[in-house]
A protein has these predicted regions:
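Terminal alpha-helical segments
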Residues: 1-325
Length: 325
């Protein structure tokens, strides 16, 4: 009997010539991380009010018109993505909207983080990795991020980041294989995804290193020699994993995984129960946090004018005042 699952996982495709990853194992962790974040956003009461209190000591910065416009542009992008996710929550089929939901979620996070960076120092980065690194350096590494978006690891050297994960867990052994039901389990799930993301970024960094001149000079194909390991660890040391790094990896689940993922299998719809809701709840929390920081940074009068203008002229259904007021 013809089966895409059997064909893909045993014969591979042109892009995955060996075999494609088995979606049965990847889908639960995808859903369970977002559920964990959703639980923690609600448990911590993350909204514009609590974020405004968190950023109460933030000093105002006077930027140029172009810097201010970049901030406003990125926030408009973010709230528009949130409006889309709120609309997706009403879909009777969660599998219909899961893939586009992930993409909308990521770009909402990315735009909100870009607005924070522009408000902080008047810059905008050229690529997603640069944005993730800059956001971590300016915010997460300096305790300027609220839970559950502040979990981070300071290195990609496995033996070192594993110690950091163990310290962060403090004995919480809950894994992503199960769906969290309370804040304690959700925290454990977030630790698991953070660890997995660090491992993924480690692998990605190693692959890039193998293409470098420094590695090719060693005339090796892996990191088994002492010289290769030393070169690798120098590259991995000081490279962090923070929330935007995790979000970047997460986006790839929608953009770059095989078609079986999210789109094949009779159990998929059941596994996705509540998933669009979780995407929207988490994005709303992050966008609220970003807006609260920006409001403090640009000052209340300009913030109110920005908010009123979107409210008058928005083409999408979500009122920004339900997020940022």
């Amino acid at each position: 009997m013809f089966s895409l699952y059997n064909r893909f996982t045993t014969q591979g495709t042109l892009s995955d010539p060996d075999e494609v990853p088995d979606p049965r194992f990847a889908l639960p962790s995808t859903v369970n991380w977002m559920r964990a974040l959703s639980i923690l956003v609600q448990d911590r009461g993350l909204n514009f009010g609590s974020a405004s209190s968190f950023y109460a000591g933030t000093q105002r910065r006077v930027g140029t018109a172009q810097e201010e416009n970049t901030i406003f542009e990125q926030l408009l992008f973010a709230v528009h993505q949130l409006s889309a996710l709120e609309a997706l929550r009403a879909s009777p089929s969660k599998a219909d909207v899961a893939r586009v939901g992930i993409v909308g979620w990521y770009y909402g996070i990315y735009s909100a983080a870009s607005a924070m960076i522009a408000a902080q120092d008047g810059s905008i980065q050229d690529d997603h990795t640069g944005t993730a690194t800059t956001w971590d350096r300016q915010f997460a590494a300096n305790n300027k991020v609220m839970a559950p978006f502040f979990y981070r690891l300071s290195t990609l050297v496995r033996k070192d980041f594993e110690v950091e994960v163990d310290t962060l867990r403090a004995g919480n052994g809950f894994l992503l294989t199960e769906k969290a039901t309370d804040a304690t389990e959700a925290f454990g799930a977030c630790c698991s995804y953070l660890s997995g993301s660090a491992d993924w970024w480690k692998w990605k960094t190693e692959q890039n290193l193998k293409s470098s001149r420094e590695f090719k000079v060693l005339n090796v194909s892996d990191f088994r020699t002492k010289a290769a390991r030393t070169l690798r660890d120098v590259r991995l040391t000081g490279k962090s994993t923070a929330f935007l790094h995790q979000a970047f990896r997460y986006r790839g689940k929608a953009n770059y995984r095989e078609a079986l993922f999210l789109g094949y299998g009779k159990s998929t719809e059941t596994l996705l129960d509540g998933y669009p809701d979780d995407l929207a709840i988490v994005l709303r929390g992050f966008v609220a946090m970003a807006g609260a920081f920006v409001a403090k940074r640009i000052g209340q009068p300009l913030w109110d004018e920005f908010l009123d203008d979107i409210e008058r002229n928005r083409s999408f259904s979500l009122s920004p005042k339900t997020v940022w007021q």
